[in-house]
Amino acid sequence: MSQDFVTLVSKDDKEYEISRSAAMISPTLKAMIEGPFRESKGRIELKQFDSHILEKAVEYLNYNLKYSGVSEDDDEIPEFEIPTEMSLELLLAADYLSI
């Protein structure tokens, strides 16, 4: 795998490839990638999250990367949709990932 990407693995063993730049938005993932951990090899197992939660977290990291330099007043930024039924689990994931 290219060093430009990181693979995140969910509790149910689904894999999500994410750009290293997007992953580095999360201080937690950044520490894993840059540290002496086996995760620094480009594969990070996040076994505390089901795939639908990890997928939404990856979506958010990509969204954040894409719109990070855009003014909040810009009408071009779409709202990031969070389904109500996922709110609590996403809050826990966001807390863990510090995003």
From Swiss-Prot:
GO terms for cellular component: Cul3-RING ubiquitin ligase complex; cytoplasm; elongin complex; nucleotide-excision repair factor 4 complex. One of its GO terms (biological process) is response to UV. Keywords: Acetylation, Cytoplasm, Nucleus, Phosphoprotein. It is found in: Cytoplasm; Nucleus. Induction: During sporulation. It comes from the Eukaryota. One of its GO terms (molecular function) is protein-macromolecule adaptor activity. It holds the Pfam family Skp1_POZ. The modification N-acetylserine is found at residue 2. The modification Phosphoserine is found at residue 2. InterPro entries: ELC1, SKP1-like, SKP1/BTB/POZ_sf, Skp1_comp_POZ. The keyword Plastid does not apply. The keyword Protein transport does not apply. As part of the CRL3 E3 ubiquitin ligase complex; polyubiquitylates monoubiquitylated RNA polymerase II subunit RPO21 to trigger its proteolysis; plays a role in global genomic repair. Prevents degradation of interacting proteins like PCL6 by the proteasome. In contrast to other members of the family it does not integrate a functional E3 ubiquitin complex. Present with 538 molecules/cell in log phase SD medium. Heterodimer with ELA1. Component of a CRL3 E3 ubiquitin ligase complex consisting of the cullin CUL3, the linker protein ELC1, the substrate receptor ELA1, and the RING protein HRT1. Interacts with CIN5. Interacts with PCL6. Interacts with SNF4. Interacts with the large RNA polymerase II subunit RPO21 in a manner dependent on DEF1. Interacts with DEF1. Interacts with RAD7. Interacts with RAD16. Belongs to the SKP1 family. This is Elongin-C. It comes from Saccharomyces cerevisiae (strain ATCC 204508 / S288c). The gene is ELC1.
